[in-house]
Amino acid sequence: LLPNVKGFVNPDDSLLAVLISHPHQDHFGLVQFLPPHIPVIIGEAAHNILRSATFFTPSGADFEKTIYLSDRKTINIGPFEITPYLVDHSAYDAYSILISANRKRLFYSGDFRAHGRKAKLFQKMIKNPPKDIDVLLMEGTTIGRGNPEDKFQTEEELIPEFVDYFDSTQG
């Protein structure tokens, strides 16, 4: 069931680190099988969320070696230069990632949106995107919302409803 990635199942020095864009299960689910000496690159808040979740659920995660991402601050791992871009997403502390090596540049969009609580981050990316990209690797969980006449509530519109509901509930 584990992916056939060098260094993931059998020890191999070619696996330098594992990069997690945000704390959703489909992005970190197999990290529990990672050899403990392999660093995990992740946002600090995302790591704290996953570490805290281990108290409540086996789907949380903690790592022995961690390298933290910070918006537009480049880190170097072996021949790779990694620049994270904080994005708006339902998972807190989510990033798009620019990876440069050997004069080539790959931009991974990660999961993102332009309509959430941090929608300004999308506009920031549009105004100042990474330049000279050779490869774009793009997530595509929602390309459309079906019928254009359908209206979906925003998070901002839902918050007062949740507050009213919680206020009216005992316990």
What is each PLM-predicted segment?
Residues 1-19, 25-171:
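His/Asp/Glu-rich metal-coordinating catalytic cores
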